Amino acid sequence: LVAAFPKRPMDLHKYSAGTVTIVGGSSHFIHAPVIAGLGARAAGAGLVQLVVPDASRLATGMLLPEATFTKQTPACVPPRADVTAIGMGLGTSQNSELLLSRLLSGSTGRFVLDADALSLLANWYARKTGALPISEGQSLILTPHAGEAARLLACTPDDIQRDRLGAVRRIVARYRSVVVLKGPHTLVAAPGRDDVFSCEAGNPFMAVGGMGDLLSGILAARWAYLAKNADGDPFTAAASAVWLHATASDALVNANPPGDPSIANTAHAVASLRVALERS
């Protein structure tokens, strides 16, 4: 996986480093997309663009001043990007469904779907007997935890945990997407591949709210960078992002003395590890 972090060329600029747009947030979940933005910046995105409600604007300015801001509405047009991450704190209201449906059905590109976007995707599948609002030419990465995976497969979280390998393969087959099944030894699987990546790094201190949002931003940034500077393979992007996130957290909690495994500190640890890899 170290090969997924090539040395940065001297003539790199913010657009060739990869651009990421993050669509999320609601009045109840103000900070989720901002956390994803922190992950994207830590993982090396050259430009982070947030499409969030007004309620998230202050948090964006305070926590991620380098990001651009677009007000989120059902009819908004998110800035174009190499990768768009959708769902963190978005909610499952009718307006959220309209926005997600319009983004997925009206454009081609690379999309990371997390959190509420996964619930909406599962609802569409159940309602329309497999018809999904996905256009030809799109490439998707889904990032469910066990509960979200259960919704995607219409089963229970216990069913997922009893057979995580089988579950990740079933989600891949049903939704024709790369899938990151989060949890102990996070799994990454992709259409057309028999192998499944299992991440051996990680620790129980990662079990805090917002850690999944951070990973979604990290994943979007790595995919955007590889799309600009390598072959852009989504499986490689997903596996390398999962590894980077977990390994950085391990370095933090295993330090002497141990570091505080907060979201902000984990983002800093991700940035430090990523820079060390990309300058070697």
At which residue positions do the language-model features occur?
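Small-residue (G/A/S/T)-rich helix-start motifs and N-terminal tracts that mark the onset
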Residues: 1-115, 119-141, 146-280
